[in-house]
Amino acid sequence: MHGHLYIILKESIKYIPILGTGMMFYGFIFLSRKWATDKERFTYRLKKLSTPHEAAVTGANPKGLNPMWLLIFPEGTNLSDNGRKASTKWAEKNGIQDLRHALLPRSTGLSYCLQELRDSVDYMYDCTVAYEGVPVGQYGQDLFSLRGSYFQGRPPKSVNMHWRRFAIKDIPLGDEKIFADWLLARWREKDELLQQYIETGSFPADGGFGEDENGKKVKGAGLIETEVRTAKWYEFVQVFVPTAALGLLMNVVFKLIGMVLRVLHLR
């Protein structure tokens, strides 16, 4: 069971009509990019996620924790023209080389998440994403917008992902500088992965043999190709049902308030 999904996003996204309301309804974590403020939000939300529940859902682990995914973007924003400029400026300010196909990561938020969750979470998964059909120098967010993908029928032909898994016990969390260097090294590896995708049209696939955490010999899955689609045509609509219901409820409440005020005014 995949369990719950929580996404860490920049605060401005929650003000998007309908979508932003839905994200707040589902408990997503919004950040202001001011650590003094964000640390309190992180502490509150992460404490809830790492607290055992008496009545955990089906699939809960032996620690009594509900299964969940916590998604964080250490870059803090989409790859775009403005994001590219900000990454270059950050690189110049810190005397480091900028990346070619990704944005430089910020380490503070991820480091705090891992430290708060390391007693309840064993692994961190790293995903590198590439969209088919994005020319070098252009950005996926400009070509595959929400409107173009869902309402104009122009989605990317394929979405390519490269996954890696890191044991949290092996990640250097004791020193902020060492962790920042470790994270930057992983991002330079991601930049090389994206370069290979540009040159070959695919990410490298692990088809060899290795060992799992128990020392058992296992074979890599290689390149996995699958098609993702909804089972029923109306499933996409169901995503918006909670937010639409909330919007209708708020509309009714405001109308009732307006009626009461008018009655009081007539008196």
Segment roles from a protein language model:
Residues 1, 23, 172, 259-267:
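Proteins with a high burden of low-complexity, intrinsically disordered sequence enriched in S/T/G/P/A and R
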Residues 1-139:
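Soluble catalytic domains of membrane acyltransferases
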Residues 3-4, 94-95, 144, 234, ...:
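Generic alpha-helix detector with strongest preference for long hydrophobic helices that associate
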Residues 10, 31-33, 127, 164-166, ...:
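Conserved beta-strand termini and adjacent loop/short-helix elements that scaffold enzyme active sites
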Residues 29, 34-37, 80, 175, ...:
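Intrinsic-disorder/low-complexity, polar/charged segments
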Residues 45, 49, 56, 87-232:
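Catalytic lobes of large eukaryotic enzymes
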Residues 221-262, 267:
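Alpha-helical bilayer-embedded segments of polytopic membrane proteins, i.e.
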